């Protein structure tokens, strides 16, 4: 089994390190990559190109996992590579014909913007260290939370401003994992995305927005169980 791990906004491939150790200890292969967070012109299509260039050409045993903003990218990857499955982890789900900003404006599910209060003249955004610790990493150890917060980058938002390049949903099976104490992406949105957009019941885990750091073993077990269920 080969898990291709697609990080969310502000993060990088580093955020998956603990989860990769757990997945590989269970006999799986993993791939992670850095997406061009700081490129103002990079949208979901560009992100998908980066993912596709990093993953195996034969995707028949690949599951692509997209965290948070990475959820806007993984259906595009699936449309090209036809992996075994895709997993949205506390993820945004695109709607063909709309931008995610349009989705946000249309929702009445309690969604509030998860963007940080610090904006920059170039249109990017960034998180103050303490705010990131409280929002993304509140259930991690203080050492892990602070180290992660210090590695966050600026983020540009072309991927949410643009109309998604996804034209329609394909046949690749999807799963959705939400975290019940998520402070970055409201649980109401996650349930709406899973049930109303994907037509599936979400898998619910305890904890905050970053289970790959706070509960990597549990997350690895859940990802493995989804794979078994799809076989």
Q: Where in this protein do the model-derived segments appear?
A:
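Conserved alpha/beta-hydrolase catalytic His-Asp/Glu region
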Residues: 121-168
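Short beta-to-alpha linker loops that shape the active-site pocket of alpha/beta-hydrolase fold enzymes
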Residues: 34-38, 92, 208
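Active-site loop/oxyanion-hole signature of alpha/beta-hydrolase fold enzymes
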Residues: 29-63, 77-79, 100-109
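Conserved serine/cysteine hydrolase catalytic core
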Residues: 154-217, 221
């Amino acid at each position: 089994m080969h898990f291709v791990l697609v990080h969310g906004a502000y993060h990088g491939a580093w955020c998956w390190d603990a989860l990769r150790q757990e997945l590989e200890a269970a006999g799986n292969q993993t791939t992670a990559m850095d997406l061009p967070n700081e490129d103002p012109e990079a949208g979901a299509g560009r992100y998908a190109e980066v993912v596709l260039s990093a993953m195996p050409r034969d995707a028949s045993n690949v599951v692509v996992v997209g965290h948070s903003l990475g959820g806007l990218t993984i259906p595009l990857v699936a449309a090209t590579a036809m992996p075994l499955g895709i997993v949205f982890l506390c993820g945004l789900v695109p709607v063909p014909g709309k931008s995610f900003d349009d989705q946000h404006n249309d929702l009445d599910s309690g969604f509030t913007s998860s963007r940080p209060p610090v904006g920059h003249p170039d249109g990017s955004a960034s998180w103050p260290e303490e705010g990131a610790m409280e929002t993304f990493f509140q259930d991690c150890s203080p050492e892990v939370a602070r180290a992660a917060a210090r590695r966050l980058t600026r983020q540009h938002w072309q991927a949410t401003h643009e109309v998604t390049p996804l034209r329609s949903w394909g046949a690749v099976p999807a799963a959705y994992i939400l975290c019940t104490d998520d402070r970055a992406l409201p649980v109401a949105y996650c349930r709406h995305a899973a049930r109303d957009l994907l037509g599936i019941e979400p898998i619910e885990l305890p904890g905050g927005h970053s289970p790959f750091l706070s509960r990597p073993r549990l997350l690895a077990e859940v990802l493995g169980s989804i794979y078994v269920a799809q076989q």
